[in-house]
């Protein structure tokens, strides 16, 4: 099966290290392809660690490489090492590859994409997600669960609306994920990824 070409450049490849630069959403796809192909090639006997960093296109390459290496080092410190650290060097943004792909990308980001696919007001959608992010990051405040539920309720269409079934699935999952610490952190990461990937054309972020 031929895979779509990606806007990614190999800056350095040697030994057991590789440094890629490219369109940030393509970097995510490239990282997952490399991980999958490497696991297939080695029959799952070897592991990869990765750091994924988002910077403006004018950010110095040397500094990007250094900071990405810090994220990679953090991923290597994860139990089993077979992990990826994204955005910042923290345990909250470090995931085993399978969890990252299955739970963050295929589950949570996918739901965000499906729900917002038919939303006409993109900027309003982003503002809504930023409000959700604030509540997710401050979940230790008990009142924020009620605020989270209220925000979801404000999106509810009439039950005879064709979009109601999608809303019901979205709101149920979001509420459940908020209440589970592991799912909550994965949702935070998924929202970050979704927001970056839906920025207006003309933005010049790279990874």
Q: Can you say where each PLM-predicted feature lies in the sequence?
A:
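Charged, helix-rich terminal subdomains or tails
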Residues: 1-207
